[in-house]
């Protein structure tokens, strides 16, 4: 037995043998040497290239600008504004004569040119490109007419929400973030969406008495499709991080309906339903689609009618200016013949003092008393909106009057870009909440929008200029100096003694007049 046991070969595990026919070969495992431990490399900081130059200075001779800049101690002459704000001016004693030239206005903005060209391609027409501006016409419906209009507003919003729910169900944008191209073709086509929503549309028309016009419901479907398109293009071009289009809130403050031009007849719209309609202006010569808006706070019905402004020639002066927006003065304007200071911040605080006191009181009541009735909450929120609206109306009045004054006196305006978003952010702890509120009330971004629109209307070029190094640079010699909180710029090299904001406005003008400067 012992000999038999000796002759038995031990079993080899399957992992350690390779079968090749009848023979077996043992697999040899060789231990590899561990790799030499190399010292870890420190992460190299990537240097981000910036386009910002080290200096923005350009000599006055190269741009053909005079060295004149007034001293801080000067007497301003007041300009009549017919409003609550102050507008002061100081003229150059050695004023040079200004040349005049003829210019055809209004100038059509490039965005509207693109839209009109696309419309001509789609409709296969050769309509001339025109300058379009909206006209406000207020209407005064009776109580019975108001009831009909309110049902129409509700049905328009309901149809809009139904179409957006239908489009979202097609899953155009997937969870991964990619876009389903096949689904976009179906969704972006208004006719295919109308066919899919036909049953809902017919039920809505039959439910109303008097019945709503089918074209008004179709406009709601078209508006939903166009809004979805714009949101999709913004997502593709990375203007927005997340694709999200939400339905309308049925109890929102502002409600709209879109009415076609064919419905405006006999001084009214939809004459079978509204045979007579009182309005602030006659409802005639309407050849484009109109939007009717209702504001629940003001309880006003307003028609926004697009109008074509005809072209005409105007005598313009060859006079350019630089504008520095700031916190001491709303605007500081510099040109070769004069300097202007528009609306000191103290006047803004005094005019909006009562409104903000009431706003703070209402906010305290809402915070300290959370268990309020729904009616009480609605009243308080309505009061908040009322006082905020008063402040915005005051700013709106100032914006339009100031922009009209500037556009009529200058043919080129270079305005500094003020990044208000970063200033008002919570991360910025340098500025106090009171200063942030002042900046928010002045709303510089809205002013630049209104100024550019008025510039196109009256033939004035508006250039947005980056404010980098405009306050620190001497406009006469180009030396850079850190001012801190001082209001006066005193140059040590050339001896220039001027106001801080006026020096910045002159630098903004010089940067905007550079022939190689491009808007960013």
Swiss-Prot record:
List keywords of the entry alphabetically. Answer: DNA recombination, DNA-binding, Metal-binding, Transposition, Zinc
Where do the segments described as Disordered lie?
21-52
Presence of the UniProt keyword Metal-binding in the record:
yes
Which ranges are annotated Basic residues under compositional bias? 21-47
GO molecular function list: DNA binding; metal ion binding
Has the keyword Zinc-finger been applied to this entry? Answer: no
- Detail which positions bind Zn(2+): 474, 477, 491, 494
Q: Name one GO biological process term.
A: transposition
Family affiliation = In the central section; belongs to the transposase 2 family.
What protein name applies here? TnpB-like protein L79
């Amino acid at each position: 037995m012992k000999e038999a046991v000796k002759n038995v070969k031990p079993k080899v595990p399957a992992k350690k043998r390779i079968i090749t026919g009848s023979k077996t070969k043992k697999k040899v495992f060789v231990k590899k040497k561990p790799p030499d431990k190399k010292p870890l490399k420190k992460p190299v900081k990537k240097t981000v290239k910036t386009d910002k130059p080290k200096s923005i200075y350009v000599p006055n001779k190269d741009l053909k600008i005079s060295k004149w800049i007034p001293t801080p101690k000067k007497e301003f002459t007041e300009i009549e504004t017919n409003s609550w704000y102050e507008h002061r001016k100081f003229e150059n004693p050695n004023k040079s004569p200004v040349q005049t030239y003829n210019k055809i206005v209004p100038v059509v903005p490039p965005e509207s040119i693109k839209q009109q060209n696309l419309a001509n391609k789609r409709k296969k027409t050769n309509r001339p490109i025109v300058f379009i501006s909206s006209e406000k016409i207020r209407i005064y419906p009776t109580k019975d007419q108001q009831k009909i209009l309110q049902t129409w507003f509700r049905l328009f919003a309901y149809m809009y929400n139904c179409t957006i729910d239908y489009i979202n169900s097609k899953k155009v944008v997937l969870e991964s973030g990619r876009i389903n191209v096949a689904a976009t073709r179906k969704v972006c086509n208004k006719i295919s969406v109308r066919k899919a929503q036909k049953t809902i549309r017919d039920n809505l028309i039959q439910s109303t008495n008097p019945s709503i016009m089918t074209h008004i419901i179709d406009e709601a479907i078209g508006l939903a499709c166009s809004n979805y398109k714009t949101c999709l293009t913004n997502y593709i071009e990375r203007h927005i991080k997340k694709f999200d289009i939400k339905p309308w809130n049925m109890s929102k403050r502002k409600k709209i309906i879109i009415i076609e031009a064919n419905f405006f007849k006999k001084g009214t719209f939809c004459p079978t339903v509204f045979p007579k309609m009182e309005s602030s202006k006659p409802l005639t010569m309407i050849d484009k689609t109109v939007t009717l808006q209702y504001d629940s706070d003001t309880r006003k019905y307003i028609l926004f009618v697009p109008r074509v402004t005809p072209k005409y020639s105007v005598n313009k002066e060859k006079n350019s200016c630089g504008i520095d927006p700031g916190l001491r003065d709303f605007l500081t304007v510099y040109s070769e013949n004069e300097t202007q200071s528009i609306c000191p911040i103290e006047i803004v605080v005094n005019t909006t003092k009562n409104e903000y006191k009431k706003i703070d009181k209402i906010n305290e009541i809402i915070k300290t008393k959370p268990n309020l009735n729904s009616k009480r909450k609605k009243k308080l929120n309505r009061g908040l909106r009322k006082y905020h609206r008063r402040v915005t109306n005051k700013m709106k009045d100032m914006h339009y009057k100031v922009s009209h004054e500037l556009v009529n006196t200058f043919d080129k305006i270079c305005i500094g870009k003020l990044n208000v978003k970063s200033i008002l952010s919570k991360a910025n702890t340098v500025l106090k909440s009171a200063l942030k509120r002042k900046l928010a009330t002045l709303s510089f971004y809205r002013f630049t929008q209104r100024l550019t629109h008025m510039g196109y209307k009256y033939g004035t070029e508006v250039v947005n200029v980056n404010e980098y190094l405009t306050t620190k640079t001497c406009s006469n010699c180009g030396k850079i100096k850190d001012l801190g909180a001082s209001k006066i710029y005193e140059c040590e090299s050339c001896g220039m003694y001027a106001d801080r904001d006026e020096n910045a406005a002159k630098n903004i003008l010089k940067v905007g007049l550079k022939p190689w400067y491009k808007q960013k």
